[in-house]
């Protein structure tokens, strides 16, 4: 096979877009408790802001409850403040060196807005995937124009890039559908 574009590099970049999308939708609060809900929370600790998971252990003891075990007893109130200020709508209850965080039921309006946010994340990921596709296609056109690859090779590689793009976008749609079902499940 002649030179053209690095298909593996394009695949890596498309897989990166899927990974970012998975991370984005994992942070969306559904009806079930998940430690990922607290990923955006930062805590004022030891003179700087730190992610919550660097000062405490987060577990899910019940489907609608999170438990945060703070490692340093002096940090409990700072952790509580960080969770309250995170705009996640959570109200932690201090229980010794632990915090219990009951997750309120999501109302229909909130569920629909979360689905809309998930769709926005999906669209952002699809745009990133299309940019990768465009970079690949531009690389093929340049390689063909420069005489590095022939027209047949260029066409074959562009079909592979298009197939890879379609598969990656289908994966985004599949993940979005799963998340949408999870959010709307009462």
UniProtKB/Swiss-Prot annotation:
GO terms for biological process: cytoplasmic translational termination. The keyword DNA repair does not apply. The lineage of its organism: Bacteria, Pseudomonadati, Pseudomonadota, Alphaproteobacteria, Hyphomicrobiales. InterPro entries: Ribosome_recyc_fac, Ribosome_recyc_fac_dom, RRF_sf. HAMAP family: RRF. This is Ribosome-recycling factor. It comes from Rhizobium johnstonii (strain DSM 114642 / LMG 32736 / 3841). One of its GO terms (molecular function) is ribosomal large subunit binding. The gene is frr. Belongs to the RRF family. Keywords: Cytoplasm, Protein biosynthesis. One of its GO terms (cellular component) is cytosol. Pfam families: RRF. Responsible for the release of ribosomes from messenger RNA at the termination of protein biosynthesis. May increase the efficiency of translation by recycling ribosomes from one round of translation to another. Residues 144-163 are annotated as: Disordered. It is found in: Cytoplasm. Its main location: cytoplasm.
